[in-house]
């Protein structure tokens, strides 16, 4: 194999956020931008020599071109083996599972998650560690440090090969294995859930509408829900992955999944509605005419997880991101299990899962998952819901109503202020932090402030400290509001305000 060493220089703006590096697609297509970052992934993790990686993405615009570049660079950097989804398609949960199942050295996932795609949309590159989870800060910091000093990258002369056909080919000493993107993931789901009970429920007339939002989950949901479990044909809508997600915004919430909402609120609505996002790690749940908030979904799944075979024993614990409502805390207290509060970002759950401290995890941003992989998992959440409904017998609305009667209800909302000037956003947060010490005891709209702090997280496993993770204002009656800046946007700043 012949390869070239191309001279380059550091490019500004390559600091990974909570879920890798996300930018406008046009930025990733600029000369050396992708190549620099990929080389720094290899250099920042001890080099690629002799290593195996999982590679895939959500099918958005520039996915195949980026994978071709990664194949050539991995080969030039001495990688031993690449496992790639056919046509470059791999959901983030499936990539996490493959990383763990085949004991690879990590995964390179191409996605900007729920952000829009297309030539004028967003693109992203994320490195997952060998445990299948998002790289922790010590790794992303090392990658970022390399971006500040890079002088060259390596790339093979040879073309990347055809990833549209299942099989293997080689570039030099690097073997590229193209696999069916669904097979391994479906086998895992069959181990976790009572497929017989779910199939029987569908056979008895239960109906579902799953909106794949023209994103990566389409092939997975069609194969598993319609093919294996017997849901009626057409239950999965918008099932074909599209480079621009059908011109939509693949974010599973009532605004962007309005087609699903209209179906679930219409005449003759199905019994259950669900949607997933760009890379398949988020979920939206609906009953007839009713949206289930992600925070309530996490609480309900925790309360009824024992109905699924994989979670029939006592849960080790549950974890939620700090802005997520405390509904799940009430369930954990009754079950007698610990409830961990972490910063936003799935990577913070990784140590808890690896150490066996938590079984289920969730975020208010529509991500839920468990210890089966090290990522949140949209279709997993849907299947756990179906397992619960099949075994319990109540519908979604009744199950939630009974849950509120038993545990009480946490009223909750989130408000996003997007693409605001970064200086203005940081200035607002700095001003709020400066006032925190004087807030307790003051009145706001007739409510007394009881506490105010800037959330800091000391990881109970490795004692790493993450500071300035969001300002929390607590009131005497138990209400609270939270303000934080998000790390998943591609330009400007996103300010999120949470009310509970």
Regions found by a protein language model. Give the residues of each.
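Positively charged, low-complexity intrinsically disordered leader regions
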Residues: 1-36
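Gly/Ser/Thr-enriched, mixed-charge loops and adjacent short helices
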Residues: 2-11, 32, 119-268
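Buried hydrophobic positions in well-ordered alpha/beta secondary-structure cores of metabolic enzymes
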Residues: 19, 55, 95, 108, ...
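Short glycine-rich or small-residue beta-strand-to-loop segments that form or flank ligand, phosphate
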Residues: 24, 52-58, 111, 126-128, ...
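Glycine-rich phosphate/diphosphate-binding loops that line cofactor/substrate pockets in enzymes
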Residues: 38-53, 195-203
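N-terminal small/polar loop signature for handling phosphorylated ligands or for N-terminal nucleophile
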Residues: 43, 54-121, 223-285
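Proline/glycine-rich low-complexity loops and linkers
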Residues: 87, 137-183, 287-364, 368-369
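Phosphate-binding and adjacent anionic-ligand microenvironments
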Residues: 270-272, 276, 285-288, 310-498
């Amino acid at each position: 194999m012949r390869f070239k060493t191309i001279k380059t220089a550091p490019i500004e703006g390559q600091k990974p956020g909570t879920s890798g590096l996300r930018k406008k697609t046009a930025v990733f297509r600029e000369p050396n931008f992708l190549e620099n970052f990929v080389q720094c992934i290899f250099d920042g993790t001890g080099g690629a020599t002799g290593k195996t990686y999982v590679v895939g993405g959500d099918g958005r615009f520039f996915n195949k071109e980026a994978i071709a570049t990664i194949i050539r660079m991995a080969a030039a950097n001495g990688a031993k083996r690449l496992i790639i989804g056919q046509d470059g398609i791999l959901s983030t949960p499936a990539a996490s599972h493959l990383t763990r199942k085949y004991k690879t050295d990590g995964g390179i996932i191409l996605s900007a998650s729920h952000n829009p795609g297309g030539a004028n949309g967003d693109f992203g590159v994320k490195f997952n560690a060998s445990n299948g989870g998002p790289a922790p800060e010590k790794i992303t910091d090392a990658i970022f440090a390399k971006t500040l000093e890079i002088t060259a990258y390596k790339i093979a002369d040879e073309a990347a090969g055809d990833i549209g056909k299942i099989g293997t080919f080689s570039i030099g000493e690097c073997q590229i294995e193209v696999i069916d993107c669904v097979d391994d993931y479906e086998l895992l789901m069959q181990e976790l859930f009572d497929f017989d009970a779910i199939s029987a429920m569908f056979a008895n007339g239960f109906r579902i509408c799953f909106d794949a939002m023209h994103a990566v989950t389409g092939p997975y949901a069609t194969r598993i829900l319609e093919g294996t479990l017997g849901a009626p044909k057409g239950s999965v809508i918008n099932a074909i992955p599209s480079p621009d997600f059908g011109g939509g915004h693949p974010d599973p919430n009532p605004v962007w999944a309005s087609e699903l909402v209209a179906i679930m609120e219409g005449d003759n609505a199905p019994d259950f509605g669900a949607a997933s996002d760009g890379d398949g790690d988020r979920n939206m749940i609906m009953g007839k005419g009713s949206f289930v908030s992600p925070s309530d979904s996490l609480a309900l799944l925790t309360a009824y997880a024992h109905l699924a075979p994989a979670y029939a024993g006592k849960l080790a614990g549950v974890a939620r991101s700090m802005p997520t409502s405390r509904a799940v805390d009430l369930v954990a207290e009754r079950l007698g299990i610990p409830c961990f509060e972490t910063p936003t970002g799935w990577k913070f759950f990784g140590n808890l899962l690896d150490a066996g401290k938590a079984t289920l995890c969730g975020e208010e941003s529509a991500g839920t998952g468990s210890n089966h992989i090290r990522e949140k998992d949209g279709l997993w959440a849907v299947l756990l819901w179906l397992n619960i409904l099949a075994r319990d017998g109540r519908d979604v609305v009744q199950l939630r109503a009974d849950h509120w009667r038993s545990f009480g209800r946490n009223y909750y909302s989130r408000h996003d202020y997007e693409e605001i000037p970064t200086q203005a956003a940081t200035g607002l947060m700095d001003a709020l932090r400066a006032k925190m010490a004087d807030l307790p005891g003051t009145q706001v709209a007739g409510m007394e402030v009881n506490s105010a702090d800037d959330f800091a997280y000391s990881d109970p496993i490795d004692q790493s400290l993450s500071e300035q993770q969001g300002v929390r204002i607590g009131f005497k009656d138990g209400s609270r509001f939270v303000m934080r800046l998000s790390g998943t946007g591609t330009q400007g700043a996103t300010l999120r305000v949470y009310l509970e």
